[in-house]
């Protein structure tokens, strides 16, 4: 009887430790507020980071943020400063308009599309060339 109680208690402890958001994440992934994160200290272009994240998990993409608390959580597990965010082509041509309100239909950009990188130490976001290489955090 005592052994049954001990085993039952052990199973209860295991169940309670797995219940919650952590149980939904694959091993090697961290959980926060119902999302799963995996930090990769591996520099790559933004396009490669997007592809890499979807290879790690079908629903995964470079990280995006919903709150400053989410950023604080990620900073606590990071070992590097700069990483790609899941934001690309911030000067989205479909939304551009001239100051008089007319649509931009002629373009002569001198650079390629821009992507966004985050500096973890102070949560500052910067636009940069998508062809540069930075680390990536995948999220789903």
Curated annotation (Swiss-Prot):
Signal sequence extent: 1-23
Transmembrane keyword on record: no
Tissue: Expressed by the venom gland.
Keyword entries, A-Z: Disulfide bond, Hemostasis impairing toxin, Secreted, Signal, Toxin
Cystine pairings recorded for this chain: 25-36, 53-138, 115-130
Alphabetical list of Pfam families matching this protein: Lectin_C
Compartment annotation: Secreted
Regions that span the bilayer: none
Homology family: Belongs to the snaclec family.
Function in brief: Interferes with one step of hemostasis (modulation of platelet aggregation, or coagulation cascade, for example).
Subunit-structure text: Heteromultimer; disulfide-linked.
Name the record gives this protein: C-type lectin 6
Organism: Crotalus adamanteus
